[in-house]
Amino acid sequence: MHISELTHPNELKGLSIRELEEVSRQIREKHLQTVATSGGHLGPGLGVVELTVALYSTLDLDKDRVIWDVGHQAYPHKMLTGRYHDFHTLRQKDGVAGYLKRSESRFDHFGAGHASTSISAGLGMALARDAKGEDFKVVSIIGDGALTGGMALEAINHAGHLPHTRLMVILNDNEMSISPNVGAISRYLNKVRLSSPMQFLTDNLEEQIKHLPFVGDSLTPEMERVKEGMKRLVVPKVGAVIEELGFKYFGPIDGHSLQELIDTFKQAEKVPGPVFVHVSTTKGKGYDLAEKDQVGYHAQSPFNLSTGKAYPSSKPKPPSYSKVFAHTLTTLAKENPNIVGITAAMATGTGLDKLQAKLPKQYVDVGIAEQHAVTLAAGMACEGIRPVVAIYSTFLQRGYDQIIHDVCIQKLPVFFCLDRAGIVGADGPTHQGMYDIAYLRCIPNLVLMAPKDEAELQQMLVTGVNYTGGAIAMRYPRGNGIGVPLMEEGWEPLEIGKAEILRSGDDVLLLGYGSMVYPALQTAELLHEHGIEATVVNARFVKPLDTELILPLAERIGKVVTMEEGCLMGGFGSAVAEALMDNNVLVPLKRLGVPDILVDHATPEQSTVDLGLTPAQMAQNIMASLFKTETESVVAPGVS
């Protein structure tokens, strides 16, 4: 049968192994075609096709709960649960989300986007089930990368003390997270894979048995059964650690053998308490290029399936903020051996893989452990090291207590570099970098800045690594820079808390922060076309705010507009409003940014329009609200 004919995942139950293999092939084909066309996560989902099909053929999906950790590997799940025909809309505005969303499907039992949450959520559902006297299975599927997160280990520790609570944890062990895994847990799993008995079983056993006199040829057809039996004899303690924690352990099993998976899941489902199924998979399975380069093909922009290469841009683009950050930090680190870059399993995304390649002794990857990364940096700062924590804005949320308790209370000079701040696009609400201004500016002993372009990012990097007055943070957006000239050396640090005037006018004061400075300048051009002259200020710092510059300008001009790519509640505009009120400068103020909503998946350009943050929209808003000018549209050549 064809997967498009499936009307419910429970229909997998009646299919033969051969039919399930055909369904798996079709899922993998659709997965590849869709990601190649529209972009998305490639390797994770390809690695769990058979796992998903086998598991769903043993469950009753009308009542059983399946929780996928992170969710980027759940594309096969989406295709099997009613979204096959819409899958071509993956990660597009109003289309299928790239992660799990409870609002999208009744089969998405728990939304996610960040790692290490599935076991906690699954255990919560299992305890609620038992408290209500209900009967359904709960399965949490977690990767070996996410298993390095402390939250996952906390949940395992808890579940292991509940011997009568039925919960199945499936470890999708593909030796990878996004970048190669680090830490003792990863090392233990690798030790299991690479142990002499396991290597003998996987590499040599069949050849040795073939050469046995008289019986070798007759045993060859039963080779898989022989391997399985001997595996259980020679590696009986593979799951010793897990069983000591209170789980019944199964594995490691072949994550691409439907029969072995189904047989194991059926046995595991009979266990009356917590059970742990260790499944070995290959990330990118079925697409040779992705199997060979599991980091490079973790996630892809649209690409040519034959060559594996992304489609070339119609015109050259400036380097991304991440690339400029990585290049500049590496240059600074060469000059100062006390600079150390720290990442939480995002070396490639943040650009710190460049630092690792050039200066490995000045690079630390802690795994998916943001809390640990922050306090590790605090400890380093105590000893005179200049730690630079490169982290996505959305992930720094996970280390919030550590920022306050371990860094700022002790006034330690830790430098936080927040990549993907602001609108991130197709990854959706779990990854939007909207909240960092609000959650950081309220903390004492912390400076918060944002560059208007990639050249100013270089200056702020120098500022950050030389700042000793406490913690300092820099937020910068996803994507390419503006295209301004860059310096290779000789960067000068900025004066803390000092803004700059970029344009002068007497009618309205436009205060742009970070990525909104250039849109502020474009907005000023549009206002000029309508006879309104604006002063444009690049704020640079939201904390400390340059009140010496801003307050006199606001008082003289009499109308103020703030522009930010972040949430309005507690954000840059709020900081300006507080400063105006505290100093009794009572002038009209218009704050432009992200209102109290979740920004769903779409392209950054689409989200910008939806939020009313294009220069044309902002100019129209300003004229309507501050100048009471009625106009249907504001258009200027080359400005949207």
Curated annotation (Swiss-Prot):
One CC-aspect GO term: cytosol
Pathway(s) annotated for this protein in UniProt: Metabolic intermediate biosynthesis; 1-deoxy-D-xylulose 5-phosphate biosynthesis; 1-deoxy-D-xylulose 5-phosphate from D-glyceraldehyde 3-phosphate and pyruvate: step 1/1
GO BP annotations listed: 1-deoxy-D-xylulose 5-phosphate biosynthetic process; isopentenyl diphosphate biosynthetic process, methylerythritol 4-phosphate pathway; terpenoid biosynthetic process; thiamine biosynthetic process
Binding site for thiamine diphosphate: 72, 113-115, 145-146, 174, 287, 370
Top-level taxon of the source organism: Bacteria
InterPro entries: Dxylulose-5-P_synthase, THDP-binding, Transketo_C/PFOR_II, Transketolase-like_Pyr-bd, Transketolase_BS, Transketolase_C, Transketolase_CS
CDD domains: TPP_DXS, TPP_PYR_DXS_TK_like
Pfam families reported in the protein's UniProt record: DXP_synthase_N (PF13292), Transket_pyr (PF02779), Transketolase_C (PF02780)
Cofactor dependence: Mg(2+); thiamine diphosphate
Residues that coordinate or bind Mg(2+): 144, 174
Uppermost EC category: transferase
Family indicated by similarity: Belongs to the transketolase family. DXPS subfamily.
PANTHER family assigned to the protein according to its UniProt record, in alphabetical order: 1-D-DEOXYXYLULOSE 5-PHOSPHATE SYNTHASE-RELATED, 1-DEOXY-D-XYLULOSE-5-PHOSPHATE SYNTHASE, CHLOROPLASTIC
Protein known as: 1-deoxy-D-xylulose-5-phosphate synthase
Native species: Synechocystis sp. (strain ATCC 27184 / PCC 6803 / Kazusa)
